């Protein structure tokens, strides 16, 4: 019999006190889509344990130095920083010259599906509207679609999920 009490049913959540979060950055020049399993071209990895703001700054400094040594930065228009929106990842857009943060597709899809899964027959239509707004870079339209989903959502728990998805997508625009 499991011991499940404290504020709610489920696993007892303990604070993480002795965890280390390694950081991983990889640079590539494109994607080879010839095979079923796509391959990143001219791949270079940076990684390790970089603790705190100073550690993250050190990591991005290493990445920036590699970019400057390997590429003619006068011809670079943008350096896309692709990730899940974690603060340390977004900070790459500040530390890397011409850096621009872009939410990765996996997390974007994950949150759009969370926001629309309860819509049954209308889920595909709602997803299409959100994706269309993203492709067209129409943040206001995406917000309007999320607001409409919130209006037609009955369950309070599901409304919280939709709101969290809306905040995540629009917050990482």
Can you describe what each PLM-predicted range is?
Residues 1-173:
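Catalytic center-proximal scaffold of phosphoryl-transfer enzymes
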